[in-house]
Amino acid sequence: MKTRLCIVRHGETEENISHIFQGHLPGTLTENGRSQAVTLRKTVDVSVFDAIVSSDLRRATDTVTILLDGKVPRDWVRSALFREKDWGSLTGQVVGKADFDAFPSDVETKEMLYDRAGKALCFLQDKYAGKTVLVVSHGLFLQSFMARIARVPLEQVGSMRRLGNCECRWMEI
């Protein structure tokens, strides 16, 4: 039996607008980001989900809270496994000022992110087999996560289109 996933990237944040490496920062939704979540709520009925699984970072949990609109979910797991790529010592810095030729050694590699996305996929397969699950997370993480679902090899993950803020994509595992 297939597990259906509604995969959503969090709403726009102040850090998105400022082109900041957010990584594991909590992030602050902009008014537009909140509005994006309200708009998504009109097209995604949260009552159809057996569970919600999200990153434990505030920008993701705030997006879920807006989508819920006061409803109490059956099951909501907030997990560090679904966090954005860890930018290490680049976290909080402006993207345009980073030296892409000499990334610090504490930055999570694409291989590490791909591996973590695989663990997240296994978690969902084990815990929610045959269920319908809302997954709310982050752009780069979700790119690797969806690549794992589609069985796209690591070398081709960059060719996967990333989700926009509060964009939803349905996939089955």
Segments predicted by a language model, with ranges:
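Glycine-rich phosphate-binding loop signature in dinucleotide/nucleotide-binding domains
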Residues: D45-V48, L124-K131
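Loop-to-helix element that buttresses phosphate recognition and phosphoryl-transfer chemistry
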Residues: L5-D62, F103-G118
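Generic beta-sheet signal
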Residues: L5, K131-G139
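Active-site signature of alpha/beta-hydrolase-fold catalytic machinery across serine-
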Residues: I66, S144, R148
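Short active-site segment of divalent metal-dependent hydrolases/proteases
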Residues: T13, F141-L142
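Short hydrophobic/aromatic-enriched beta-strand-loop microsegments
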Residues: T28, V72-S79, L154-R162
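Phosphate-coordination/substrate-recognition cap region in phosphate-metabolizing enzymes
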Residues: V38-P104
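Domain-level recognition of soluble alpha/beta enzyme cores
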Residues: A150-I173
